[in-house]
């Protein structure tokens, strides 16, 4: 893997698929995709106090943090990706929002499509947002 960011939709989906494949070849840890700070400031519905949106993938599981409102959007999105299922929802007493773990038993390209849809539709990012691979 030689590139670590992308901003065009097709490039982002390829970045996710390549990152997931590289993660699988390494066989340990997780891969984290994080939205660029400039893209966060361009998003109208994101609360900057909640931090930068990110999505992690490891061992067939997607991990995201979201608000209750974003969780409802995520559930709606999952209806379009029937192979993906919520495994666990964790609510912390110390922090607002929820952590969601989603079973993602699919090929890297399909997972990449889902990850891009999470950023665009759950977090409400504009079409041309930049995402980085920040941990592999």
Predicted feature descriptions by range:
Residues 56-86:
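Mature extracytoplasmic domains of secretory-pathway proteins
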